[in-house]
A protein has these predicted regions:
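ATP/NTP phosphate-donor binding region
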Residues: 1-91
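Short glycine/serine/threonine-rich phosphate/pyrophosphate-binding segments
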Residues: 20-23, 45-48, 74-77, 99-104, ...
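Short Gly/Thr/Asp-enriched flexible loops that form oxyanion-binding sites at enzyme active sites
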Residues: 81, 100-114, 149-152
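Glycine/serine-rich anion-binding loops at beta->alpha junctions
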Residues: 89-105, 141-148, 280
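C-terminal and late-domain segments of enzyme folds
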Residues: 189-254, 258
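Gly/Pro-rich interdomain helix-loop hinge
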Residues: 280, 284-359
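Short, amphipathic C-terminal "tail helix"
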Residues: 358-390
């Protein structure tokens, strides 16, 4: 019997080479006054930033432009919102990575309401957002967060009392997601690696999540197959390999859909305090913590062969295996080793490179949530996972 489940709406999706050229046409659906948010680096080095701005201006669009240089903070969002609240913006367009997507989503949601975004953040503010927003169009330049598919914007403040919290409402899903793999060709190698590991983590965590359903399972498994086939190729050949970029773009898109409907697990549980207390990029946290967390997860589930998560981990292990016709335990052991190998090949930085050390382990463990992870790890296992990445 299939358990009941709920699947909410998705953006209009325009996927494929050259789809960025649809932007002027779709912008006009909402009006001619556009607030464009972009990242600070690769999009401009590639020439796509100038290309997109020229196309919008050539179509008679009144363009305002803001650069997002880092993960959005409450002060960043509040400042942009105050600048444009009285400007009759018709549509917000975000062209960039996950941070730009989150910033665009947050700005589009905050322009119509009063007060600081802090007042509406989950677990921090006391107000419930009414869901009003300016229409939002997402055009990602990385294959990672899948934020172009999600209903939340992640907002961070780094420091001793830092946090990573979400602004969330069903209405915050972008109206249109334009996913053009050509936009990813110029993505730097290091960012390709860490963004790819974020997508990988989201797919695996949502696949084995306690909230998974048949639709998220189908998308997550296909996304994981794409990760197996294309992640390393995008890392090694990404500047010229449009097939690998397309495969990773689809995997990231699927990861955004599955995390929205099935939730995430312990790796993302670690990401909240690590990203709040230290200036560690989100993809680095995922890339660092995935192998140790899932090694302990497999160990804790090994005596539960009928557990749905255990059965799914066997399926994923077979997807990533380089052999056939072995026992399940051999596949699972191979998958643990494969995760370590991928982390090494992608040259994922250690957490210590960002100031994290032994003395911070208890604080991180204390503030980490298991979310929808299929099994609890002990405090000792969580500490060991962190320690392995110092």
């Amino acid at each position: 019997m299939i358990d009941s489940f709920h699947f909410s709406s998705l953006p209009e999706i325009r996927f494929g080479k050259g789809k960025r050229n649809d932007l002027p046409q779709v912008v006009k659906i909402y009006g001619r006054n556009v607030l464009l948010l972009t990242g600070s680096s690769s999009i401009h080095y590639s020439g796509h930033g100038d290309e997109i701005m020229s196309a919008l201006k050539g179509a008679g669009i009144n363009l305002s432009h803001e650069v997002i240089a880092h993960e959005p903070s409450p002060s960043m969002v509040d400042e942009i919102v105050e600048t444009y609240r009285a400007s009759d913006i018709d549509v917000v367009v975000a062209v960039g990575g996950g941070s730009v997507m989150d910033a665009g989503k947050a700005v589009s949601a905050m322009i119509p309401v009063e007060g600081s975004i802090r007042m509406y953040l989950e677990g921090l503010g006391e107000k419930e957002h009414p869901g009003d927003k300016i229409p939002f169009i997402a055009l990602p330049t990385t294959s990672g967060t899948g934020s172009e598919m999600t209903k939340n914007a992640v907002i961070s403040e780094v420091g001793d009392h830092g946090f990573k919290k979400s602004l969330r409402h069903n209405n915050f899903i972008p109206e249109i997601a334009i996913i053009d793999p050509e936009m990813m060709l110029s993505c730097p190698t290091k960012l390709t690696a860490t963004a790819g590991m974020d997508a990988f983590t989201q797919l695996l965590e949502s696949y084995v999540s306690r909230q998974a359903n048949p639709m998220t399972d189908a998308l997550a498994l296909q996304g994981l197959k794409n990760i197996k086939k294309y992640l390393l190729r995008a890392f090694l050949e990404g500047e010229n390999n449009i097939e690998a970029r397309s495969g990773m773009a689809l995997a990231a898109m699927f990861s955004g859909i599955t995390l929205s409907h099935a939730g995430l697990g312990l790796v993302h549980g670690f990401a909240s305090p690590l990203g709040g207390y230290f200036h560690i990029p989100h993809g680095v946290v995922c890339g660092s913590m995935m192998a140790p967390v899932f090694a302990h997860t497999i160990d804790n589930l090994i005596d539960q062969p009928d557990n749905p998560a255990m059965q799914k981990l066997v399926i994923v292990s077979k997807v990533f295996a380089d052999f056939k016709y072995k026992k399940d335990l051999e596949y699972l052991q191979s998958f643990k080793e494969k995760l370590l190998h991928i982390t090494s090949l992608l040259e994922v930085p250690r957490l210590s490179e960002y100031g994290f050390g032994e003395e911070s382990i208890p604080k991180i463990v204390e503030n980490t949530s298991h979310k929808s992870h299929p099994v609890k790890l002990t405090t000792e296992q969580m500490e060991a996972s962190l320690r392995s990445r110092i």
